[in-house]
């Protein structure tokens, strides 16, 4: 298998580079064909990888960056005021063909602005969209947009649907069912932009559009791709993650309530732990910026080692599936 090269913004996120470097080392150990470029402060990064075996160290490069984009900085500040930020340098490595993907846990708005500036969008795409996998009763669905575009036109939603369908196919879904998230399934429901987007999708050639889906239908697995604006999508994503964490905590507390509960817990806990692990936000961490001329994966800023590993794994899949090129080819067929 040919090598995959991923640029890592090692300075992004809420907790600094330690967990990012630990996740990077774990991915190197698990994937012999993987090469990583850590972008950030060299002296700090060298200390964190000092104990790495020589075989893995040979597949790990450090590129210096003197600036860091803060989590509370405006995108315009990152774009104009920090030309040597770790985030920007990582994206430029992708642009220059020195890496095939970029993974960052940094400021979402800044990452999107820099990605659009450095990598540019694919022909026909007005705005990139953030997409991630959401667990359902039957497997997973791809949900987009997750916060990159708070206000969306019908044309934006249509483009998101096309991109989400291609991404789902790249992940192995045959003829993915595409739906618009709405407050009801009837044609009269929804705001004007959602209704107009539905009209566009109904006439789309080669797209398996199945209509509107409500929030509960998403979790029942009624669609493989669910499209909404970034305001709704971000709230849905964060609510889902909070609910999964809360349920896990409540179950653990329940089985510590008394002697009988502890006995029942000893029997049930292995299965419940498996369920908790399957639904854990860390397992599904890593949102893809679809619509760019390059692969960019956004990790949660609060992601730990396991979560950042998941983001790197998503980048690996998109490299292996050559996702931007696949998108470009399908967009020519599906966009009006």
From Swiss-Prot:
Q: Where in the cell is it found?
A: Cytoplasm
Question: Which reaction is catalysed here?
Answer: a fatty acyl-[ACP] + phosphate = an acyl phosphate + holo-[ACP]
| UniProt keyword list | Cytoplasm, Lipid biosynthesis, Lipid metabolism, Phospholipid biosynthesis, Phospholipid metabolism, Transferase
Q: Please state the pathway this protein functions in, per its UniProt record.
A: Lipid metabolism; phospholipid metabolism
What's the EC number here?
A: 2.3.1.274
Annotated InterPro entries: FA_synthesis, Phospholipid_synth_PlsX-like
* Chief localization: cytoplasm
Under Gene3D superfamilies, the record lists: Isopropylmalate Dehydrogenase (3.40.718.10)
Per the record, the domain of life is Bacteria
Pfam families, from UniProt? FA_synthesis
Q: Which GO terms describe its biological process?
A: fatty acid biosynthetic process; phospholipid biosynthetic process
Q: What does this protein do?
A: Catalyzes the reversible formation of acyl-phosphate (acyl-PO(4)) from acyl-[acyl-carrier-protein] (acyl-ACP). This enzyme utilizes acyl-ACP as fatty acyl donor, but not acyl-CoA.
Q: Which family does it belong to?
A: Belongs to the PlsX family.
Self-association and partners: Homodimer. Probably interacts with PlsY.
| Protein name per the record | Phosphate acyltransferase
């Amino acid at each position: 298998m040919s090598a995959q090269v991923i640029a890592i913004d090692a300075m992004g996120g809420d907790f600094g580079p330690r967990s990012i470097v630990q996740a990077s080392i774990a991915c190197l150990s698990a994937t012999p064909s993987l090469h990583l470029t850590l972008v950030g402060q060299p002296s700090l990064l060298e200390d964190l990888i000092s104990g790495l075996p020589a075989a893995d160290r040979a597949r790990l490069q450090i590129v210096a960056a003197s600036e860091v984009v803060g989590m509370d900085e405006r995108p315009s500040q990152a774009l104009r005021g920090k030309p040597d930020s770790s985030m920007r340098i990582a994206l430029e490595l992708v642009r220059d063909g020195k890496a095939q993907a970029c993974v960052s846990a940094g400021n979402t708005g800044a990452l999107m602005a820099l990605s659009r500036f450095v990598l540019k969008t694919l022909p026909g795409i007005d705005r990139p969209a953030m997409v991630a996998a959401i667990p359902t009763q039957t497997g997973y669905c791809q949900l987009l947009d997750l916060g990159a575009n708070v206000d969306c036109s019908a044309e934006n939603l249509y483009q998101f649907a096309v991109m989400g369908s291609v991404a789902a196919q790249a992940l192995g879904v045959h003829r993915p069912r595409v739906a618009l998230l709405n407050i009801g399934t009837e044609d009269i429901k929804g705001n004007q932009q959602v209704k107009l987007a539905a009209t566009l999708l109904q006439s789309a050639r080669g797209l398996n559009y199945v209509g509107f889906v409500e929030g509960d239908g998403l979790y029942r697995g009624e669609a493989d791709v669910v499209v909404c604006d970034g305001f709704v999508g971000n709230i849905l994503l964060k609510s889902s993650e909070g609910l999964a964490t809360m349920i896990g905590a409540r179950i653990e507390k329940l089985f510590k309530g008394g002697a009988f509960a502890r006995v029942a817990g000893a029997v049930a806990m292995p299965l419940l732990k498996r369920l908790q692990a399957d639904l854990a936000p860390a397992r599904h961490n890593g949102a893809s910026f679809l619509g760019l001329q390059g692969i960019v994966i956004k990790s949660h800023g609060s992601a730990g080692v396991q979560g950042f590993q998941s983001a790197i794994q998503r980048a690996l899949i998109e490299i292996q599936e050559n996702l931007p090129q696949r998108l470009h080819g399908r967009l020519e067929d599906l966009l009006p």
